[in-house]
Design a protein with these regions (language model features):
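Kelch-like beta-propeller repeat domains
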Residues: 1-343
Length: 343
C-alpha cells in the first residue's frame, strides 16, 4: 500500500481517515487504490474505536423492496442503502436480526411469497440460514446455520453471543428449542428449552442483562437466569415494545407507557399511530423511533398506503416530544427488521 497522505506516516493518516463519517467511505475508496485498501482495513475501524469516532447507525428492512436493508445516520439525518441480501428466499420475512462483533446478523425466517402465475407457495416458511453483513468490506456472507429452522422467534445478544428461542419450525409447528451462537468461532450450541411454546409469535428483550421471551397474547414472560429459564407473571401491556437505557417502553391504546415489573406510567400520547400497522418501534440512543408501516383501507377508500415515515420520541428532555426524521429513501411499508449497529 503506497503512502496514504503524502508527508504523513500511514499510522497517522489512518487516524485522519478514521474521523471521516461512514457515509462518505464509498467516496474515499475511489480516490486511489491505497485509500480503498485503507477503507476496507480492520486497522481503520480499530482507530475509529480508539478515537471514539465510531458511529451508531440504525438498520432497517421493510417488505418493499425485497431483501433490501438501509442504514440511518442520526447525526446527519440521512439513509444509506446496503447491497441486497443474497438469500435465495424471496421476500424473506419473520427472521431474527441482531448486531454483534460489528456485524449485522439476519437469522432464519422464511417466506409466504406466492408465485403470481401458478398460485403455488414460492418459499419455505422457516429456514435455518444465517447471514452476516460486514460494514468493513460492505458485503454479505453466510455463516453457520442454526441447528433448528425457525421463524417468528426470540432473538437477542447476550455477552456478545446470539441467543435464539421459540418460534415456529418448517411445518409451522411452535417449538420451545433454544440455542446460542458464538460469532467469533461460527458455532451453534443447544441450550435448555423454554418451559413452554405457544401458538403465537414471540420476541426477545434484554432487560437488566437477562433475556426475556415474550409471547404475543400471554401475560407470562420466560426469563433466562444463571439457573436456567424461569416463568414470571408480569401482566405487561400488549403492544409494540422496546428497551431504552434498560427501561421497557410499550405502545398500547394510543399511548406510550414506561413499564416496570408491576407498574406503569404514561409517557406521552401516540394517538397519531392508531391507524398505522406493521411499523417498528425501536429504542435508539436516548430516543424511541417509530418507523414505516402501512395505513390500511378505511371507509370507501380501499387503498393501502405504504409508509416510509420516521417519527422520533426524545426521552432525554424534561418533557418528551415527538419529532420528524428523514424518511427512508428506499424501504417502505411493513417493517421486517430493525436493529442498532455500531461501526
Amino acid at each position: 500500500m503506497s503512502a496514504l497522505i503524502e508527508g504523513l506516516p500511514d499510522a497517522v493518516a489512518i487516524r485522519c481517515l478514521a474521523r471521516v463519517p461512514y457515509y462518505l467511505f464509498p467516496k474515499l475508496e475511489v480516490i486511489c487504490r491505497s485509500w480503498r485498501e485503507a477503507v476496507h482495513s480492520t486497522e481503520l475501524y480499530k482507530a475509529r474505536e480508539e478515537l471514539k469516532s465510531s458511529e451508531n447507525l440504525l438498520c432497517v428492512c421493510a417488505f418493499d423492496p425485497e431483501n433490501v436493508w438501509q442504514l440511518y445516520d442520526p447525526t446527519r439525518d440521512l439513509w444509506i442503502t446496503l447491497p441486497v441480501l443474497p438469500s435465495k428466499v424471496r421476500n424473506l420475512a419473520h427472521f431474527g436480526v441482531v448486531s454483534t462483533s460489528r456485524k449485522l446478523f439476519v437469522l432464519g425466517g422464511g417466506s409466504d411469497a406466492v408465485d403470481p402465475l401458478t398460485g403455488d407457495q414460492d418459499g419455505s416458511f422457516a429456514t435455518n440460514e444465517v447471514w452476516a453483513y460486514d460494514p468493513v468490506v460492505r458485503q454479505w456472507a453466510q455463516r453457520a446455520p442454526m441447528i433448528v429452522p425457525r421463524a417468528m422467534f426470540a432473538c437477542c445478544v447476550v455477552n456478545g453471543k446470539i441467543l435464539v428461542a421459540g418460534g415456529f419450525t418448517t411445518c409451522r409447528k411452535s417449538i420451545s428449542k433454544a440455542e446460542i451462537y458464538d460469532p467469533d468461532n461460527d458455532v451453534w450450541v443447544s441450550i435448555p428449552d423454554l418451559h413452554y411454546s405457544h401458538n403465537s409469535a414471540c420476541t426477545g428483550l434484554v432487560i437488566g442483562g437477562e433475556v426475556h421471551v415474550v409471547h404475543k397474547g400471554l401475560t407470562t414472560v420466560q426469563v433466562l437466569t444463571k439457573d436456567g429459564w424461569r416463568v414470571h407473571e408480569h401482566s405487561w401491556l400488549q403492544g409494540p415494545m422496546t428497551v431504552v437505557n434498560g427501561s421497557l417502553y410499550v405502545m398500547s391504546h394510543g399511548l406510550i407507557y414506561k413499564q416496570d415489573r408491576e407498574s406503569r406510567k404514561v409517557v406521552i400520547s401516540a394517538s397519531g399511530f392508531k391507524r398505522r400497522i406493521g411499523f417498528a418501534m425501536m429504542g435508539f440512543r436516548d430516543e424511541i423511533y417509530v418507523i414505516g408501516g402501512v395505513i390500511g383501507p378505511e371507509g370507501w377508500n380501499s387503498d393501502i398506503k405504504k409508509m416510509s415515515d420516521v417519527d422520533v420520541l426524545t426521552l432525554g428532555n424534561e418533557k418528551p416530544v415527538w419529532q420528524k426524521a428523514a424518511s427512508m429513501t428506499r424501504c417502505r411499508g411493513t417493517i421486517l427488521g430493525c436493529v442498532e449497529l455500531k461501526i
